[in-house]
């Protein structure tokens, strides 16, 4: 007998969301009461645009470092296969507004001050696809996303 599985992201109506935004997808409570939260960090509008892999890859590496300097409890921040944003998994509860502020501040640093030397994990030893990076693309996309503003609501624009 197979277990019915519902994957929340496949149930989301991608035609009604308004990117860029941060959305709490859900929370799980572990056997000892620990809470893990899953966030949809949507940077571009689904089915209208996508971030090229080299730029998204560089944003991924930078966010892995930058988010951890701004908030405790990040477990992982991984890109969606559709290249419109990231899943971010966190210990504990945080408001979408708090996460949006962290993402905004991180993207601002990418856009304004990040140099190639700041990008972690860009060697053959530290990355499984080390040649597929573009700081130029990451910076340009960060600027575009910041110009649009990041909302803490996926369905109504409430820019933080």
Curated annotation (Swiss-Prot):
Q: What cofactor is needed?
A: Fe cation
Which InterPro entries does the UniProt entry name for this protein?
LuxS_sf, Metalloenz_LuxS/M16, S-ribosylhomocysteinase
Keyword Lyase set for record? yes
> What is this enzyme's EC?
4.4.1.21
Q: Which UniProt keywords apply?
A: Autoinducer synthesis, Iron, Lyase, Metal-binding, Quorum sensing
Any idea which positions bind Fe cation? 57, 61, 127
Query: Which terms does the UniProt entry file under GO BP?
Result: L-methionine salvage from S-adenosylmethionine; quorum sensing
- A single MF term (Gene Ontology): iron ion binding
- State the reactions this protein catalyses: S-(5-deoxy-D-ribos-5-yl)-L-homocysteine = (S)-4,5-dihydroxypentane-2,3-dione + L-homocysteine
One cellular component GO annotation, for this chain's record? cytosol
Tell me the cofactor note: Binds 1 Fe cation per subunit.
Q: Pfam families from the entry?
A: LuxS
Q: Tell me how this protein assembles.
A: Homodimer.
What family name appears in the similarity comment? Belongs to the LuxS family.
Q: What does this protein do?
A: Involved in the synthesis of autoinducer 2 (AI-2) which is secreted by bacteria and is used to communicate both the cell density and the metabolic potential of the environment. The regulation of gene expression in response to changes in cell density is called quorum sensing. Catalyzes the transformation of S-ribosylhomocysteine (RHC) to homocysteine (HC) and 4,5-dihydroxy-2,3-pentadione (DPD).
Q: What is the protein name stated in its UniProt record? A: S-ribosylhomocysteine lyase
């Amino acid at each position: 007998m197979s277990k019915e599985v519902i994957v929340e992201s496949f149930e989301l109506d991608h035609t009604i969301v308004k990117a860029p935004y941060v959305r709490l997808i859900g929370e799980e409570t572990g056997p000892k009461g620990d809470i893990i939260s899953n966030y949809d960090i949507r940077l571009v509008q689904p089915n209208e645009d996508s971030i090229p892999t080299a730029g998204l890859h560089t944003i991924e590496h930078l966010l892995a470092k930058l988010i951890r300097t701004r908030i405790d409890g990040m477990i992982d921040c991984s890109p969606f296969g559709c290249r419109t944003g990231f899943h971010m998994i966190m210990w504990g509860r945080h408001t979408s507004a708090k996460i949006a502020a962290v993402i905004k501040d991180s993207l601002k640093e990418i856009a304004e001050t990040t140099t190639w030397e700041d990008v972690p994990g860009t060697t053959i030893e530290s990355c499984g696809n080390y040649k597929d990076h573009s700081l130029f693309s990451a910076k340009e996309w960060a600027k575009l996303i910041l110009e649009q503003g990041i909302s803490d609501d996926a369905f109504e624009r409430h820019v933080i």
